[in-house]
């Protein structure tokens, strides 16, 4: 409803361009058929999971943008962000990198709730902003763009190890039970192709 309201506002006020902030999560699970997600990739999302609402809402938002492009002649661009990090992170953030840093600052070992083999793209927040501005200013109407930097792709266990080493702590693996696991993303490999 929020995205539709913003699109209606943009049409009503003759916006020059509408940017819909999307996410790498729209790609769903990597089934091993690609190394990197390009903007045309369509992965599997199990809609019968606790976390399905977020990636599905982003997919629906993108589809709604395309409808407004066609039906209302609205100029739209879709930057797809990946996991960002930097000085804007909050103590209350529940993302893995935030929790790792929080534990390190508190002088505690870093606890991984998986084997840590998830392989993700990360983007420094200033680079994410630069990518966003580039898409707004230079992107083509109706196109989606991955905001990513291959140099920042890393396995979760390696990221945890870097932070733990810097803090003089250890990485501890505590695999979750099924109830706790239900709240986590099923994606194990989400590396974006940011070349577009």
Describe each region flagged by the PLM.
Residues 1-8, 12, 16-17, 25-26, ...:
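Catalytic helix-loop patch of NAD(P)-dependent Rossmann-fold dehydrogenases
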Residues 7, 66, 98-102, 133:
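Solvent-exposed, non-membrane alpha-helical residues enriched in polar/charged side chains
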Residues 32-37, 91-95, 99, 125-127, ...:
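Short, glycine/charged-enriched secondary-structure capping and boundary segments
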Residues 50-54, 82-94, 114-125, 149-152:
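Glycine-rich "substrate-gating" loop/helix at the edge of Rossmann-like oxidoreductase active sites
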Residues 60, 64, 68, 100, ...:
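Hydrophobic alpha-helix immediately C-terminal to the catalytic Tyr-X-X-X-Lys motif of short-chain
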Residues 104-196:
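C-terminal substrate-binding subdomain of Rossmann-fold SDR/epimerase-dehydratase oxidoreductases
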């Amino acid at each position: 409803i929020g995205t539709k309201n913003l699109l209606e506002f943009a049409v009503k006020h003759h916006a020059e361009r509408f940017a819909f902030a999307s996410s790498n999560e729209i790609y769903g699970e990597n089934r091993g058929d690609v190394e990197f997600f390009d903007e045309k990739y369509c992965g599997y999302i199990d809609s019968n999971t606790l976390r399905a609402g977020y990636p599905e809402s982003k997919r629906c938002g993108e589809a709604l943008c395309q409808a407004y492009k066609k039906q209302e002649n609205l100029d739209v661009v879709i930057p797809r962000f990946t996991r960002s990090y930097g000085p804007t992170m909050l103590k209350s953030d529940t993302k893995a990198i935030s929790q790792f840093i929080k534990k390190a600052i508190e002088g505690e070992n870093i606890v991984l709730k998986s084997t840590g083999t998830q392989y993700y793209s990360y983007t420094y927040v200033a680079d994410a902003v630069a990518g966003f501005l580039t898409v707004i200013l230079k992107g083509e109407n109706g196109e989606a763009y991955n905001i990513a930097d291959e140099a920042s792709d890393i396995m979760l266990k390696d990221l945890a190890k870097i932070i733990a080493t810097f803090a003089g702590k250890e990485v501890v693996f505590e695999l979750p039970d099924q109830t706790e696991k239900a709240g986590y993303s099923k994606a194990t490999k989400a590396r974006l192709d940011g070349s577009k």
